[in-house]
Amino acid sequence: MAMKIGTAAFKERVSEGIDNEFMRGAVSGAQERLRTRRLQAAEELGNWEDWRSHAEEIRQHVLDNLDFYLEQLAENVANRGGHVFFAETAEEASSYIRDVIRQKNAKKIVKSKSMVTEEINMNEVLEEEGCEVTETDLGEYILQIDDHDPPSHIVAPALHKNKEQIRDVFKERLEYKQTEKPEELVMHARSVLRKKFLEADVGITGCNFAIADTGSVSLVTNEGNGRLVSALPKTQITVMGMERIVPSFSEFEVLVSMLTRSAVGQRLTSYITALTGPRQQGEADGPEEFHLVVVDNGRSRILGTEFQSVLQCIRCAACINVCPVYRHVGGHSYGSIYSGPIGAVLSPLLGGYDEYKELPYASSLCAACTEACPVKIPLHELLLKHRQNIVEKEGKAPISEKLAMKAFGLGSSSPSLYKMGSKWAPAAMTPFTEDDKISKGPGPLKEWTAIRDFPAPHKSRFRDWFKDREKQKGEE
């Protein structure tokens, strides 16, 4: 699965999301629960704004010194017997992973949750190679066996499905014969996945944060699948975005605390795992061979630009969990594996405006996302910058909008035209006016007034009122 999901036009995706009542209900309920838990967890920690500022400083420092920390990380991974590959593009990353699989003559792969592996289209590349790739995160596994349904949320990928739908998928694909009770569904998935872990030739993981001064990679999970993926297969491949790095475990401690509280409202997740290279002499488990793939895929182009702060993201989805637009349209409407406010900023940077020019407009600019972000990314400001770029640099504004703005500019800059327009506007809008509101506007106002009323022009103009007032004062 590449970064782009689906081929439908943006308006079609949005309409489909709005028409999906179950999805909107599920998203709304999840947002309320996760928001409440996040606020409680933040209050428990205390001095939340100070923690946010500290986390922001850590991420900014890393980005400003990224070359140093990446070099340090690579050196320490190599010192522990691991292999490091820096991939400039998605194709380079997936090709390197495919080559490692070929060298090992591996056919069965288990994989923990990773957004960047979806970004580089890794699963599809390996499946074309004849490999069986099994997602072991429960949400991702459900989507995989349901005809590779795309994820709709960064943290909860199967948020758009209910337990009855999941039961039906299990019955069709896994010969499931029990009820839709979550406990029974989980136990059945567990029994299936355990066999996959034991049979796997290669394990592939993502990386929440890499620790530069030790050469470690970390996995933050609630299911424990990350540990099995990294401990049982003889070969482990970890894939990370080049920005997902911290200087030491001291900074890791701060960021993982912010991550777990912001993502799911927990002090810590059930499992926090740090892996440092292949199995060393005297160690009981772990892979015999370890590969770290560091993915650029457009990230270096963002460094040093007005959008650099988006690379501070720790993938907690706190912005998604407060977004009113996401609440109504869902994750699939964004057409990218990165949805919500963070996706609306990041997707155009990685995939280009031609593919994602609509996403910066999928926002009310209420700034709830910015307030929720644990590393203080100014998301609503970055969305505005995208809009400016789309119009000024890319020339993507619709022709109708350009003509309307030119006409407005011409009329506003000419006293005689402005006077004439303000005189005739009330009469021109009369057929569309009811109770001093335009409820079915013409032309550009049609879509706007389909869901809201537009104030009708006043019949008396300010210039006329002022003229009459001055006349009355003179008569007095």
UniProtKB/Swiss-Prot annotation:
Electron transport among keywords: yes
Alphabetized PROSITE patterns for the sequence: 4FE4S_FER_1
Keywords, comma-separated and alphabetical: 4Fe-4S, Electron transport, Iron, Iron-sulfur, Metal-binding, Repeat, Transport
Chain sites annotated for binding [4Fe-4S] cluster 1: C313, C316, C319, C373
Domain 4Fe-4S ferredoxin-type per the UniProt entry, residue ranges: 304-334, 353-382
Highest taxon above the source species: Bacteria
Binding site for [4Fe-4S] cluster 2: C323, C366, C369
GO biological process, one term: lactate metabolic process
GO MF term set: 4 iron, 4 sulfur cluster binding; metal ion binding
Gene3D superfamilies, A to Z: Alpha-helical ferredoxin, NagB/RpiA/CoA transferase-like
Function: Is involved in L-lactate degradation and allows cells to grow with lactate as the sole carbon source. Has probably a role as an electron transporter during oxidation of L-lactate.
Family the entry assigns: Belongs to the LutB/YkgF family.
NCBIfam families: LutB/LldF family L-lactate oxidation iron-sulfur protein
UniProt name for this protein: Lactate utilization protein B
Organism this protein belongs to: Bacillus velezensis (strain DSM 23117 / BGSC 10A6 / LMG 26770 / FZB42)
Lineage start: Bacteria, Bacillati, Bacillota, Bacilli, Bacillales
